[in-house]
């Protein structure tokens, strides 16, 4: 069987163009206090807010960003050890590091993040993948809406399979974005993924 190199992914519309075609406008951002005071007589909304915020009072740090992305983990059962990327330190240093993934391995991306002050709507994780300077893929994952709490949230993408074959092996450069409906950039970072025949070569 002849091996094929990955083909560049052609994007007909990016997210901004799609939003404008649908005439979608996100609702204006409200503070947590405003949201808690709204619709006190609406039982369904009370349940929804309870789901987002829990039962206890929310204690927030006014100096902290509302959304903090802490780690990215590649969840792969066949990996010889954990594959985790710390996103709270020097993001420039991540550009020089390379994560190894064995070809054909099944994996999922897990994003760890915290919400500190206000409910955030329409969170999404976007990843652009390049090889030799050419964009070969773009993936957008809808994360959802979350309220503030002391514990971290985790978001897990669907299972993906790493490319395989001699032509698919090599280093892929990723540009990742954690954003929301208001197009607020909570975190952007770049990292490298090397597809190899074996975990260690």
From Swiss-Prot:
GO molecular function terms listed in the Swiss-Prot or TrEMBL record: GTPase activator activity; GTPase activity; Rho GDP-dissociation inhibitor activity; small GTPase binding
- Has UniProt tagged this entry with the keyword Magnesium? no
The lineage's top-level taxon is: Eukaryota
Alphabetically sorted, this entry's keywords are: Acetylation, Cytoplasm, GTPase activation, Phosphoprotein
Which Pfam families does the record cross-reference, listed alphabetically?
A: Rho_GDI (PF02115)
This molecule's function is given as: Regulates the GDP/GTP exchange reaction of the Rho proteins by inhibiting the dissociation of GDP from them, and the subsequent binding of GTP to them. Regulates reorganization of the actin cytoskeleton mediated by Rho family members.
Q: Does the keyword Cytoplasm apply?
A: yes
Q: What is the recorded name of this protein?
A: Rho GDP-dissociation inhibitor 2
For the modification N6-acetyllysine, which residues carry it?
A: 21, 25, 40, 47, 102, 124, 175
Q: Where is this region: Disordered?
A: 1-38
Tissue pattern of expression reads: Detected in bone marrow, thymus and spleen.
Q: Where in the cell is it found?
A: Cytoplasm, Cytosol
For this entry, list what GO says about its biological process.
cellular response to redox state; negative regulation of trophoblast cell migration; regulation of Rho protein signal transduction; Rho protein signal transduction
Family, according to the entry, reads as follows: Belongs to the Rho GDI family.
Q: Which residues carry this modification: Phosphoserine?
A: 145
Q: Which Gene3D superfamilies match?
A: Coagulation Factor XIII, subunit A, domain 1
| UniProt modified residues of type N-acetylthreonine | 2
Question: Self-association or partners: how does it assemble?
Answer: Interacts with RHOA. Interacts with RAC1. Interacts with RAC2. Interacts with CDC42.
Q: Which PANTHER family match?
A: RHO GDP-DISSOCIATION INHIBITOR, RHO GDP-DISSOCIATION INHIBITOR 2
